[in-house]
A protein has these predicted regions:
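FAD cofactor-binding and catalytic pocket of flavoenzymes
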Residues: 108-212
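Generic recognition of stable, solvent-exposed alpha-helical segments in well-folded globular domains
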Residues: 12, 67-71, 79, 125, ...
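Glycine-rich loop(s) and the adjacent beta-strand/alpha-helix scaffold that form part
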Residues: 33-34, 44-122, 188
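Conserved redox-cofactor binding core of oxidoreductases
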Residues: 1-49, 109-113, 120-121
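Short acidic/polar mixed-charge low-complexity motifs
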Residues: 40, 49-53, 179, 192
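FAD-dinucleotide binding site
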Residues: 1-7, 11-16, 22, 31, ...
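Rossmann-like flavin
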Residues: 1-8, 83-96, 191, 195-205, ...
């Protein structure tokens, strides 16, 4: 927001609405699958505090995101017929496209030693980002570049860092990838995470554009 705070759905909406009498917020409720009567969705099967039960309603809005949405559809019997049969999931609808065309934004974090005596630490300057079209690309604004300096146990330093020197970091991210992957189920157990095949940079044009950036 204008104060430099990273906003979320909880901060933006729930914090001002949680005291409404017609609103109940309950955590730790796990959706196992969508329930069908023939081919009509009538509710969901959920698990909460060790109990498994059904919630049926005229309207249920289920927001599973890019990963859990196809996972729940397949667990519920909607997806590639043979894959569901192999896991003994009752078929509701053969829909081969469920779980396909998974796309993400591959990125590279670059770290450099600075030739300047001092690197600026103005927070506003560090929030600058740039979208641009990679040379030779037919897709406009397909690349994003931003200043970033981030290290952790998951992303260790690429070069030894000297506390007496200054460094610059950049992030280059492909925002409109052509490579695509898929999501597949490991089992019919909804608590088991699905397998994700991202196929990053599988398309030669993605690889070329990342090199150009």
């Amino acid at each position: 927001n204008v104060d430099g705070m990273r906003m979320s759905v909880a901060l933006t909406y729930l914090s001002i609405a949680r005291h409404r009498l017609n609103l109940t917020i309950r955590g730790e409720v796990f959706v196992r699958k969508v329930r069908f009567d023939d081919r009509k969705a009538i509710g969901v099967q959920v698990e909460s505090q060790g109990d498994i039960f059904n919630l049926d309603a005229e309207e249920i809005i289920l927001c599973g995101g890019a990963i859990n949405s196809p996972q729940l559809l397949m667990l519920s019997g909607i997806g590639p017929e043979q894959a569901l049969k192999d896991l003994d999931i009752d078929l509701v609808k053969d829909l081969p496209g469920v779980g396909k065309n998974l796309r993400d934004h591959p990125s590279a974090f670059l770290l450099f030693e600075s030739c300047m005596d001092q690197v600026g630490d103005d927070p506003k300057a560090q929030q600058v980002g740039m979208r641009f079209t990679t040379p030779g690309s037919d897709i406009r604004n397909d690349m994003q570049m931003s200043p970033i300096f981030m290290t952790s146990e998951h992303r260790p330093d690429t070069i030894p860092l000297d506390p007496d020197k200054n460094y610059l970091g950049f992030s280059v991210a492909l925002q409109k990838a052509l490579s695509n992957g898929e999501i597949t189920l490991k089992s019919s157990d909804p608590t088991e995470h699905p397998t994700l095949f991202y196929n990053y940079l599988d398309h030669p044009e993605d690889l070329r554009r990342m090199r150009e950036a």
